Every structure is written in structure tokens, then in C-alpha cells.
Design a protein with these regions (language model features):
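Hydrophobic alpha-helical bundle signature of multipass membrane enzymes
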Residues: 1-101, 109-136
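Membrane-embedded catalytic cores of phosphoryl/pyrophosphoryl-handling enzymes
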Residues: 89, 93-195
Length: 195
């Protein structure tokens, strides 16, 4: 028996234990990624003394997500790993997730990229979001849509992308992009709210 598949099946069996827990995990696995989007918008829009650093963090995290997603897309084209619910009829895909490439877990990968940046820049709430990213990752196994190694692969790609961004000229590009994005968003909000 494949240990990766066995773990998914055992975790997924817990869906029959508690309806409330299953509903909670369903909400996390389907909509949990929105927590990162909302947090990013709050970081960008909130007033305060460290606004420039918060906005730079948002841009770096966004660049990381874009690069990691491109890598994930390329991996999925080269190697289409079947999802756990495709390989074992006992695994219940209660989210209705489509049967596309399983490796890596994009939710885990993108959550890890964002959290790495938040922790690196000491953003408020970063530790709480790190815990939530872990819960989101676990929910993907619980839902029967990913293997543990999909999660590990996602975190590994996130780490590589994080190193790439901070080890190349991308960090300076992010600074220029932050300045431009700040000017545009500030102008838009001034225009909207001064009318």
C-alpha cells in the first residue's frame, strides 16, 4: 500500500466522525485562500507609519505567488499526478474538486509563499496566518484532494521561490513596483473619496 494514499484515506475517514468538523474543514479548504487576499488588502490599504513596508511585503508576496504558480503550472504539464480521490474509491471528495494535477498543492504553496514573506518582514498577524496556512494545508488532505507529499512539494517550491526573489534583482523590481502601485492606488482612492 502506498503510504501517501493510506494517510489521505485515514484522514479522510474522519469526515464521517463529526458533521460540524467536516463542514468547518470544507469551508477552510474551499474558501480559506480568501483570508490571504483579505489580509493583503488590509495590509495595503490600512493607514499607518509603516505603510511603505507593508505594501512592499504585499508586492513581494504577490510576485512569489505568481512565480510559484507558473512553476506549478509547468510541473502539472510535465507530470500529472492523479488525485487521491481518483486512485481510491473510498476517499470522499466532498468539495467536488476537479480531477486535475495533484502535485504540488497550490493552496499550500501559495499560502507558504505569503507566510514566508509576512514572517520575514515581521508583519502584524503573520504568526496567526502561518497557523491558518497549516490548517488550510491539512484541510486539503482531509478533503481527499491532496497527498502529504503534495503539501511538502508546495512548501519546498515556496521556499525556493522565496530564496529566488530575495537572491536576485526581483527584490529591487518589487520596490519600484510598490512605489508605482502605491501612487496609482492612492490616486484612485483620493479621486473616489474626494468627489
Amino acid at each position: 500500500m502506498n503510504p501517501d494514499l493510506y494517510i489521505v484515506r485515514k484522514v479522510n475517514e474522519a469526515t464521517s466522525i463529526s458533521r460540524k468538523a467536516s463542514l468547518f474543514m470544507d469551508l477552510v479548504t474551499r474558501y480559506g485562500h480568501w483570508a490571504f487576499v483579505i489580509y493583503g488588502l488590509l495590509l495595503w490599504l490600512a493607514p499607518g507609519k509603516n505603510r511603505k513596508e507593508r505594501r512592499l511585503c504585499c508586492v513581494l508576496a504577490f510576485l512569489g505567488v505568481v512565480i510559484a504558480s507558473l512553476l506549478s503550472f509547468a510541473i502539472g504539464k510535465v507530470w500529472r499526478r492523479r488525485r487521491p480521490f481518483e486512485r481510491d474509491w473510498r476517499i470522499w471528495n466532498f468539495t467536488g474538486h476537479k480531477a486535475n494535477a495533484s502535485f504540488p498543492s497550490n493552496h499550500t504553496m501559495n499560502g507558504a509563499v505569503v507566510v514566508m514573506e509576512l514572517l520575514r518582514m515581521h508583519m502584524p498577524g503573520s504568526h496567526l496566518l502561518a497557523v491558518f496556512a497549516g490548517l488550510l494545508a491539512f484541510s486539503r488532505i482531509f478533503a481527499g484532494v491532496h497527498y502529504p507529499t503534495d503539501l511538502l512539494g508546495g512548501v519546498a517550491i515556496a521556499g525556493l521561490v522565496h530564496r529566488l526573489i530575495h537572491g536576485t534583482a526581483l527584490a529591487s523590481f518589487a520596490g519600484a513596483l510598490t512605489t508605482f502601485g502605491s501612487a496609482v492606488s492612492d490616486w484612485i482612492f483620493d479621486w473616489i473619496f474626494k468627489k
